[in-house]
Amino acid sequence: TDPDADKGEFLAEGGGVR
C-alpha cells in the first residue's frame, strides 16, 4: 500500500518508516 497511508497505521506496529 502507500507508504504515506501506512505511516499512520504502521506506526503502531513500527513499520511506518518504509
Curated annotation (Swiss-Prot):
Subunit structure, interactors included: Heterohexamer; disulfide linked. Contains 2 sets of 3 non-identical chains (alpha, beta and gamma). The 2 heterotrimers are in head to head conformation with the N-termini in a small central domain.
Protein name: Fibrinogen alpha chain
Domain comment in the entry: A long coiled coil structure formed by 3 polypeptide chains connects the central nodule to the C-terminal domains (distal nodules). The long C-terminal ends of the alpha chains fold back, contributing a fourth strand to the coiled coil structure.
The keyword Coiled coil appears for this protein: yes
Described purpose of this protein according to its UniProt entry: Cleaved by the protease thrombin to yield monomers which, together with fibrinogen beta (FGB) and fibrinogen gamma (FGG), polymerize to form an insoluble fibrin matrix. Fibrin has a major function in hemostasis as one of the primary components of blood clots. In addition, functions during the early stages of wound repair to stabilize the lesion and guide cell migration during re-epithelialization. Was originally thought to be essential for platelet aggregation, based on in vitro studies using anticoagulated blood.
Highest taxon of the lineage: Eukaryota
Any one GO CC term of the record: extracellular region
Chief localization: secreted
Organism: Lama glama (Llama)
Gene Ontology biological process terms from the UniProt entry: adaptive immune response; blood coagulation; innate immune response
Entry keyword annotation includes Disulfide bond: yes
Cysteines paired by S-S bonds: none
Keywords assigned: Adaptive immunity, Blood coagulation, Coiled coil, Disulfide bond, Hemostasis, Immunity, Innate immunity, Secreted
Cellular location(s): Secreted
Post-translational modification: Conversion of fibrinogen to fibrin is triggered by thrombin, which cleaves fibrinopeptides A and B from alpha and beta chains, and thus exposes the N-terminal polymerization sites responsible for the formation of the soft clot. The soft clot is converted into the hard clot by factor XIIIA which catalyzes the epsilon-(gamma-glutamyl)lysine cross-linking between gamma chains (stronger) and between alpha chains (weaker) of different monomers. Forms F13A-mediated cross-links between a glutamine and the epsilon-amino group of a lysine residue, forming fibronectin-fibrinogen heteropolymers.
